Amino acid sequence: MLTLKCNAQIKKYIVPASLVFVAGGFEGAMDGLQFHYDKPNQFWNPDISWTNKYRNNDPLQGKTFRGKYLVFTTDGWHLMKFGRNAFTMGAIVTAIGEKRKWWVYIVEGLSYWTINRIGFNLTYKLF
């Protein structure tokens, strides 16, 4: 019976832990692109991809589309940022509504932060 309860407790952390891990991976890719990417790729290289949000890649011609809600479709850095934010919000939403002792939030927060940093370092080192 105790084993069954422990397994149930562990299972409820798998989804949010997986989400923050993937979010960390997206953030690692963001920073890798920003600081270490040197290939001449119009979508992934931030030195040139920032122009993708403008008509004909020319800021003087104005933006490709109105607003900034689709900017994640214009370059790799913003796509990774969108993924990081989406997976982080997913992890937060999975825990809403559960009543816990105050210290459990601290332990969970530190645990998820550690898992997130592992995901970050795995992808950041790819660049």
Give short role names for the model-derived ranges.
Residues M1-K11:
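Bacterial Sec-dependent N-terminal signal peptides
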Residues Q9-F127:
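Catalytic phosphate/metal-binding cores of nucleic-acid and nucleotide-processing enzymes, i.e., regions
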